[in-house]
Each structure stands twice: as C-alpha cells, then as structure tokens.
Curated annotation (Swiss-Prot):
Keywords for this protein: Acetylation, Cell cycle, Cell division, Coiled coil, Cytoplasm, Cytoskeleton, Microtubule, Mitosis
GO BP terms, alphabetized: cell division; centrosome cycle; spindle assembly
Protein task: Contributes to mitotic spindle assembly, maintenance of centrosome integrity and completion of cytokinesis as part of the HAUS augmin-like complex.
Leader peptide range in chain numbering: none
PTM-bearing positions, type N-acetylserine: 2
Subcellular location as annotated: Cytoplasm, Cytoskeleton, Microtubule organizing center, Centrosome; Cytoplasm, Cytoskeleton, Spindle
Membership in a protein family: Belongs to the HAUS3 family.
Subunit composition and interactions: Component of the HAUS augmin-like complex. The complex interacts with the gamma-tubulin ring complex and this interaction is required for spindle assembly. Interacts with EML3 (phosphorylated at 'Thr-882').
The protein, known as: HAUS augmin-like complex subunit 3
Membrane-spanning parts: none
GO cellular component, one term: centrosome
Length: 570
C-alpha cells in the first residue's frame, strides 16, 4: 500500500467527514519531504479515534473561549506546570520507603505501559494487515462482480440469440408445414413450389412433337431407311466408319459400269474430235481454194499467159497436190489418231474431278443435315438429363430434410419424455414432503441456492438457512429495484429528450444568426458589415478627393514655375 493510501485510511479511522472521496495517490507527494515524512508516518501509525476530541469537549472548549477566561498555551503552560512541580516538591516530603514504593509502582507501570505499547503496536500491525486484506478482498470482489456481470451479459446474449434462432426455426417449420397440407385444400392456398409437384405432360408432348418433326425431316432429307435409324436409338445403327474397309463405291459392278461409261465417253470424244478436225480441214481447204481461184482469176484477167506456161504450172501444182495429199493421209492415218486418243485420255481428269466434286457436295450436304439433326438430338437429350438431374437434386434435398426432421423428432421426443418424467416426479411429491414458505431449502438443491445468490447480488450478509419466504422477499426486492431503475431510466430518457430539444433549438438559433435566412454562411454581423462598406466607400471618396487636390496642386506649382509674374504676386 502506498503512503498516500495509508494517510487516507488514517483519516477514515479518525472519522474525517470527506475521507471517502479522497484519492490516496494524490497525497503521495507529501511524503517526499524528509522533514514531514517522519511526522506523517507517526501520524499514520499512532493516531486513532482516541486522539480525536468529542463533541462535548469541543463544546466545553468553545464555552471556555466565550467566557473570556485566559487559556494557558505554549511556554506559559510549561512554566505553570514547572512551578506546580516545584511547589509539590517543596510542600510534599515523603519517606524513603514511600519513595521506594512509588518507584516500584512507576517501574511496574512503565512495564505495563511498555507491554500495552507492544500490544498496541501488534494490534496496529494486525489492523493494517487486516485492512490490506480487506482492500485485496474488495478488489477481488469487484473483479469477481465484474466477471459475473460479463458472464451474465454473455449468457443473456446467448439466451437472446438462442431465442431468436428458435423463433426463426419455428417460422421456418410453419412455412414448411404450409407446403405439406392436405390435398383437399384449394390450389390458391397450396402453391406448387417443388419440381416434382409440376405435371410433365406438356413437356413430354412438346418433346414428342419435336421427335415427330425431326423424324419427318430425316425422311425428307436423307436416303430411305434413315428415319428408322433416327427413331430407334440402337447402338448397332451408330458405328464409326473404317477408312481401310471398302466402301459402297468399291463394288465391282459399279466400277465396271463406270469403266464402260468412261470408254463410251472416250469413243464419243474421239469421233467428235475427228469430225471436228475433218470439218475444220474441209472448211480451210474450201477457203484456200476460193482464195486461190480468186487470185488466179485476177491474174488471168490482167495477164496473158501462154499455154505452155499454163501446162507447166498445172503440172507443178498437181505434183504439189500429190505431196499434200500424201502428208494429209500420213497425218490422218498416223498422227491424228494418236493425238485424238491422247486428248480423249486427258478428258478423264475433268470428268472424274466433276464426279468427285459432286460426291463431295452431296457428302457436305448430308453432313450439314446430319449435324443439324445431331444438334437437335443433343438438345433433346440435354433437356432430359437436366430434368433428371433436377429431380435427383430435389430428391437428395428431400432426403436431407427428411433425415433432419427425423433427428429433430427424436430429440423432441426425448425432451418430451424427460419433461414428462420431471412432471411426474413433481406431481408425485406427497403432501407431507411439500415445502412450506418457512421450511429451509435443502443444501443439495443447488439450482435454488444459485437462484438465491443471483437474486441477492452483492449483499455481504449471508444467511445461514435459506427459506422460500426469504427467497420470495429477495425476488420482490429485486422486482422493486427493477421498477425503480426503469423509472429512473424513463426520467433520464425524458431529460435527455429535453436536452436534445433544447440543443436543437440552440442550433436553430445559431443557424439563424449565421445564415440570416439564406443559404450562405455569414462570418460576421450584417449590420457591422454594412458599416464597414459605408466606411470603405467614404475612404474611396476621400482618396479620390485627395488625388484631385494633389493633381490641382501639381498643376498650380507647374504654372508658378513657368510664370514669373505669378511668382512675384505669390
């Protein structure tokens, strides 16, 4: 314990009226001075209630002061006591035996005094220890009370939270019970909220219509028998095509027909090309003969040719014709068939290319239609799987809800059985064992004792035996305290409301004073601002007058400086 706290405790012991509101730490500075420390320690260790004057003694002393009689104090009192001692020594003459007896008595009294002083010091030490323990116990009690209040607050919060959760659970159960009403209720009061409650007839009819439309489409678009493949979802009808195996186009009859067709095309091409070549050669020969005839006619008309020259020319021309005929027959018999045959063979490439392009186009067309049908089938399958998955999820949720409700029913049944057992035990108590209001509570009834401790609170006075009547009294007192606290809370709330209303009025007055009914904040008084504006305008006018006067003075000085006559007059 600090010195300041000991000083305050000493003041409390001697009965100082305002010692309870003093703080011991505020008096620690008094013990810092060495001269005052010894006195203060003596004061804290020796002064008690016996050193304090009673009210009667104070009244007697005040009466003595009012009477005007002299009061001996200080040195005057010491001198009087000294004279009294000398007078006693002079007047009283004692024997040696009496002196010896008195000395023995003095020694015994001194010993008794010393023993009492030791006992007093021991008691003071015990008192200080007891006070220290009392303060420590008070601190522990305050801490325990604080912890108890915290625990009570925590338990209250847990209780409220549990109550809210139970209330929410009750509401959820009530909402859930609406969904499982009897089927005789109207549809308006029994809404369908689960997927299993909705009929699937419309959905199935739409899917059947979609399947029928898809089947009709496959009948129109694909070869015969494709719609049967679409209608039956047998896995044997859906197999991957192996590139290594021969296709339908590799049949021997089809290949033979194609070879014959290509041979016919080649023969037709050869015949056509020969006819074209013959026609072209005949046309060219006709044109050349006509041209030659025209030239010779012109020449015969313009020139006169001898018969001998004409015969020689005819013979030369006949020889040239023979040579040309030989060349033509050579080309016709040997060169032309080989060229035409080679050209006919080259005709296979565009024909085969066109055939393959036609097959590729057909294959692309069928592939696009197959992809369209496949996408529709995938969508239909996805919708079926989605509905199935939704039903499975809903079924799982129903199973989870069912298990939770089963566990809840089991717990409630267990609680119900326990409650019935408690009620049976309470109802089976005989009349002879029923507790009256004055019967003490059993020490084994911990719940009632705990209730009594909670109701009693910080009361230091502990009862040896607790009765139901006492418990009712404590509960009634607690009820009265609660009502008083509620009244105080209502009064404080009303005072707080009045304070807030007054504060709002003050704020409104301040806003009126600052804004003056406008939206702009006024940082100064409006009247003072107007006076400042007037003073500023007057100062501006005075400044203009001074500038005019100075300008006039400058002009006059300039005139005086230039005109000597004015200077003489001045």
């Amino acid at each position: 314990m600090s010195c300041g706290n000991e000083f305050v405790e000493t003041l409390k012991k001697i009965g100082y009226p305002k010692a309870d509101i003093l703080n011991g730490e505020d008096f620690d500075w008094l013990f810092e001075d060495v001269e005052d420390e010894s006195f203060l320690k003596w004061f804290c260790g020796n002064v008690n209630e016996q050193n304090v004057l009673s009210e009667k003694e104070l009244e007697a002393f005040s009466d003595l002061q009012r009477s005007g009689k002299p009061i001996l104090e200080g040195t005057a009192l010491d001198e009087v006591l000294r004279t009294c001692k000398t007078f006693d020594l002079k007047t009283c003459k004692l024997d040696d035996k009496e002196i010896q007896i008195l000395e023995d008595e003095v020694q015994t009294l001194q010993k008794l005094n010393n023993s009492k002083i030791q006992r007093r010091n021991k008691y003071q030490l015990m008192v200080s220890e007891t006070s220290y323990r009392f303060l420590a116990l008070n601190a522990k009690q305050e801490e325990a009370t604080k912890k108890l209040k915290q625990k009570q607050g925590f338990l209250n919060s847990v209780n409220t939270k549990l109550s809210n959760e139970l209330q929410g659970l009750t509401e959820e159960v009530n909402n859930l019970m609406i969904f499982f009403r009897n089927s005789n209720l109207s549809e308006r009061t029994n809404p369908m909220v689960f997927l299993s409650q909705f009929p699937l007839g419309k959905y199935i009819s739409q899917e059947e219509q979609s399947t029928a439309a898809l089947t009709l489409y496959t009948k129109k678009q694909f070869f015969q028998g494709m719609h049967e493949v679409v209608e039956s979802s047998n896995e044997d009808n859906f197999q991957l095509l192996d590139i290594q195996t021969p296709s339908i186009c590799d049949n021997e009859e089809i290949l033979r027909e194609r070879r014959l067709e290509m041979a016919r095309l080649q023969m037709a091409c050869i015949c056509v090309q020969k006819q074209i070549i013959y026609l072209k050669t005949s046309n060219l020969s006709m044109k050349s003969s006509i041209k030659w005839a025209e030239e010779n006619l012109n020449r015969l008309t313009n020139e006169v040719i001898d018969k001998e020259n004409l015969d020689a020319e005819i013979s030369s021309l006949n020889s040239e014709i023979l040579k040309l005929e030989e060349q033509i027959t050579h080309i016709k018999d040997k060169v032309l068939p080989a060229v035409v045959k080679e050209y006919a063979q080259l005709l296979n490439m565009p024909v085969v290319k066109g055939d393959f392009e036609l097959q590729i186009a057909k294959q692309d067309y069928y592939t696009a239609r197959q992809e369209l049908v496949l996408n529709e089938l995938i969508k239909q399958k996805a919708s079926f799987e989605l509905v199935q998955l939704s039903y499975e999820i809903e079924l799982r949720k129903h199973w989870d809800t069912y298990r939770q409700l089963e566990s809840l029913v089991q717990q409630l049944s267990q609680r119900n059985t326990v409650l019935c057992q408690h009620l049976a035990v309470l109802s089976d108590i005989p009349a002879s064992e029923q507790l009256t209001s004055r019967t003490p509570i059993d020490t084994k009834d911990h719940s009632t004792h705990r209730l009594y401790e909670l109701l009693e609170g910080d009361n230091k006075k502990k009862e040896l035996f607790i009765t139901h009547e006492h418990l009712e009294e404590v509960a009634e007192k607690l009820k009265q305290d609660v009502s008083v606290i509620q009244d105080q809370l209502a009064v404080s709330t009303q005072e707080h409301f009045f304070f807030l209303s007054k504060l709002n009025n003050d704020v409104d007055m301040l806003c009126d004073a600052l804004y003056r009914g406008g939206n702009q904040l006024l940082l100064c008084d409006q009247e003072l601002k107007e006076h400042f504006h007037q003073v500023e305008s007057q100062l501006n006018e005075l400044h203009h007058l001074l500038t005019d006067i100075l300008a006039d003075v400058k002009t006059k000085r300039r005139i005086l400086a230039t005109n000597k006559l004015h200077q003489v007059e001045r």
